[in-house]
Amino acid sequence: MGNPLILIEIHNRAGLIRFNRPQQLNALNGAVMEELAAAAESFDKDDAVGAIVITGDERAFAAGADIKEMADASSVDMLLADRISKWDRLRKVKKPVIAAVSGFCLGGGCELAMACDMIVASETAKFGQPEINLGVMPGAGGTQRLTRAVGKAIAMEVVLNGRTLSADEAYRFGLVNRVVPVEQYLNEALKLANEIAARAPLAVRLAKEAVNNAFESFLA
């Protein structure tokens, strides 16, 4: 039996979901996304959990989609995999979701981080949408969320030329909330999650919904 694709923990009132594919730099495939969505939904129903943190490891949050899975799949397989529904399930989680990012956060990994409500980054984090190098464009709302976070000019350079943003650049451009030393990034995200979890749950849920409605009103 292989290693689990994700690891799940609870830290006080923060639910932690950790990707567990270090040899693949936590590349996202259909199985990982299914387990991620299921874990997030489980935490969303758990009254003991007030906020959720998603993370990888120090080398990589997630270095993109699993290219091997994509290369091995036929167009029919890709259609049946129904990846969009897994992203949609995560988007529908009512509790705040924080991405704790260190190392590579590229392609699908960057899109996942941007789909979270907040991002805490280590100083080593690198954000990018390198899909153009593979002859495709970013999906999962990546182009819209990136543009709204950093503005059109920077988004064009990232998307059209594969530019990678350092953690400090991502902070300056408004993509991330906080940048901390690598040894502190996960604890900082858990601390933030527990601070939010201490607030009135209904108010937090409604406030998240209101902000997302304002932000995503034109997202497909």
Residue ranges of each PLM-predicted region?
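Glycine- (often His-adjacent) and acidic-residue-rich active-site loop
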Residues: E34-A37, K45-A48, G56-K92, C105, ...
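Short, intrinsically disordered, charge-balanced linker/junction segments flanking boundaries
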Residues: N177, F215-A220
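Crotonase-fold acyl-CoA enzyme core
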Residues: R91-V204, K208
